[in-house]
């Protein structure tokens, strides 16, 4: 009889340790999960801040036209000398569209930033101080190519 009580006592103590261990493991996992989500949030915030700066900084402005990365505006680093030449303007427009898709989901991730990008890109494309591609019929095609309505 004594042996049965001893065995039951050992089983109860073992069970209590298992329960405590399960509770501790679950608690530890919840704490770890909270820290991970906080770290993820902090990381996202930091990344967003960096991207926000990257997306609208001055060197980015020149890369909208591709002048910093391609030969489309080879006559002038500031893009001002296209002379409204159709081939050069087509190259610049293609660079802008390529840049748009390169930045998709990074800089351009909602309707508002999409419109900001398109407006800014169109100014660079059409303004005589920048690329000087002033064909007004191209504006709607240019805006249509960068379909902001999909957001």
From Swiss-Prot:
Coiled coil: none
InterPro entries named in the record: Mating_pheromone_EUPOC
GO cellular component: extracellular region
Chain's gene name: PHR3
Keyword Secreted listed: yes
Signal peptide: 1-16
Function: Mating ciliate pheromones (or gamones) are diffusible extracellular communication signals that distinguish different intraspecific classes of cells commonly referred to as 'mating types'. They prepare the latter for conjugation by changing their cell surface properties.
Pfam families according to UniProt: Euplotes_phero
Organism: Euplotoides octocarinatus (Freshwater ciliate)
Places the protein is found: Secreted
Residues that make up the propeptide removed upon maturation: 17-52
This protein's name: Mating pheromone 3
Gene Ontology molecular-function annotations: pheromone activity
Predominant location category: secreted
Domain of life: Eukaryota
Keywords for the protein's UniProt record, in alphabetical order: Pheromone, Secreted, Signal
């Amino acid at each position: 009889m004594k042996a049965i009580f001893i065995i039951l006592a050992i089983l109860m103590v073992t069970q209590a340790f298992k329960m405590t261990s399960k509770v501790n493991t679950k608690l530890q996992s919840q704490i770890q999960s909270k820290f991970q989500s906080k770290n993820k949030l902090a990381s996202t915030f930091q990344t967003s801040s960096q991207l926000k700066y990257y997306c609208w900084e001055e060197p980015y402005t020149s890369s909208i036209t591709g002048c910093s990365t391609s030969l489309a505006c080879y006559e002038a680093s500031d893009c001002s000398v296209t002379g409204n030449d159709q081939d050069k303007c087509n190259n610049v427009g293609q660079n802008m569209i390529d840049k748009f898709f390169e930045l998709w989901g990074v800089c351009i991730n909602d309707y508002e930033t999409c419109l900001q990008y398109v407006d800014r890109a169109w100014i660079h494309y059409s303004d005589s101080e920048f690329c000087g591609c002033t064909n007004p019929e191209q504006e709607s095609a240019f805006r249509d190519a960068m379909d902001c309505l999909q957001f």
